[in-house]
Amino acid sequence: MTMKPNPMVILTGPTAVGKTALSIALAKKINGAIISADSMQVYKYMDIGSAKIMPEEMDGVRHYLVDELDPSDEFHVVRFVEMAKQALKEITANGQIPIVVGGTGFYIQALLYDIDFTEQECDSAYRRQLEELAETRGNHYLHEMLKAVDPASAEAIHENNRKRVIRALEFYHESGERISEHNERESQKTSPYNFAYFVLNDDREKLYRRIDVRVDAMVKAGLVDEVARLQQMGCHADMVSMQGLGYKEILAYLNGTSTLEEAIYIIKRESRHFAKRQLTWFHRERDVIWLNKPDFEYDDTKILTYMMDVLQAKGILPRSE
């Protein structure tokens, strides 16, 4: 079979499932470079809480979108797609295969199907009006406004996520169309890539145990000191970076609003909830190939062999003679 253009390999799955080690082994086997689809690993100085891959673990494999932004920078889906597309160009120009690795399904979907989430020109007067309403009447009032015009968006966006609530109201105000309908239409696009979309998974109880072990290891490795250093650098709870799982809870402890034991308990609980939401997302996605670790007897070599067969069948890799 001839090789097809625009190859892309995706390796995702819930938090703590073991994506990192498998991604390195895969990259070395297929001459790949890795694009991180993680909303936290892109930030410098945020290593422990994001479970960031360290240079010595990379084993010579080039990683993009790791350690590229300051914690004060905003990182969102539009910026991710911009940066990831630039990385894709570099990787293919180097004759390598891009491997998108990470657990942020929304980012992966946007890149894979080239979904348009770019900001349109907005009516800043209307935005100011909404911001004033939020200040005077509260987030709940704004969220009720959204529920009246776009119930699906109101269902998907938490009322405390004021920025996204305002964006959805703005979109409706400017276009007369619900942003939920726009996003749904965009998500039905076909992909411009020849891709293989792998989701690594494990038994739920084992996954939850791994999450607990990982959180304990993070605390032992110095998570509290890491967050304290970030605080000294001027990082605060309103920054996108500091709203990440593990950071906001330790920040609450440092600010005296919880004990360390409570913070650790909440991180573990919220990490389990996050893993559950990730799996729900991946089950809804099209064309995914599940890699259930028990089916491969927890042997990464067997998983890799299966992945190689899939990549050859899809024309992403040449068939071995």
Language model: regions and residue ranges:
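Phosphate/pyrophosphate-binding catalytic cores of soluble transferases and nucleic-acid-acting enzymes
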Residues: 1-321
